[in-house]
């Protein structure tokens, strides 16, 4: 899987593609549905499968005090996307330049990927302050002759699957329910910083 971390680094136009667009901050079953739909379209029409997302949560720029806790690391996200058969991951920082683009300007940024189809969730928004919605995208698709596929939100029982809901379940200790929405076992990885290791001297060794 090719990984692109800067749009400025893309100098040549790519082969025709389908792009799954989203924050994908949890890569839960709803996010997977969007990506799998894009994958199926890519296979049917012999296109490259691209996932376009951000390396940081958009709220980190817009409302830093409201940045949610991560439920997946960048390394885990890359691993899962590879398993889903993604050809190209565009994982760029959400910065002031991107945040200030109009909906049309944002789509022009994607033109280098030669997309024939865009796949999004029904609550997708894009462009300055999220001014572009799914109906905006559909109108642009009709005008510019590309396909737009909008996926309905996925439910687990009666509840809509969302990263916010999954965070709440994890914080409340309902990890099994969170796992059902994630479609995998919840786990965060990190680096253990070694301490003085006094625990082993009293018969209670700890993680560090």
Question: Positions of the model-derived regions?
Answer:
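Nucleotidyltransferase catalytic core that binds NTPs
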Residues: 1-208
């Amino acid at each position: 899987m090719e990984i692109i971390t800067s749009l400025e680094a893309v100098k040549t136009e790519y082969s025709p593609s389908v792009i799954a667009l989203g924050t994908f901050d949890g890569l839960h079953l709803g996010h997977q549905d969007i990506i799998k739909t894009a994958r199926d379209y890519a296979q049917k029409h012999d296109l490259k499968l691209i996932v376009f997302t951000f390396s940081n949560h958009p709220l980190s720029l817009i409302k830093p005090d409201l940045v949610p806790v991560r439920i997946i690391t960048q390394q885990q996200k890359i691993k899962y996307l590879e398993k889903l058969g993604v050809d190209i991951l565009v994982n760029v920082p959400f910065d002031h330049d991107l945040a200030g683009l109009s909906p049309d300007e944002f789509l022009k940024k994607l033109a280098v990927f030669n997309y024939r189809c865009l796949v999004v969730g029904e609550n997708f928004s894009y462009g300055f302050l999220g001014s572009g919605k799914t109906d905006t995208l559909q109108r642009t698709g009709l005008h510019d002759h590309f396909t737009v596929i909008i996926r309905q939100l996925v439910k687990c029982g009666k509840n809509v699957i969302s990263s916010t809901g999954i965070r709440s379940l994890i914080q409340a200790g309902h990890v099994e329910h969170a796992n059902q929405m994630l479609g995998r076992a919840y786990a965060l990885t990190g680096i253990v910083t070694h301490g003085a290791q006094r625990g082993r001297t009293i018969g209670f060794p700890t993680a560090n």
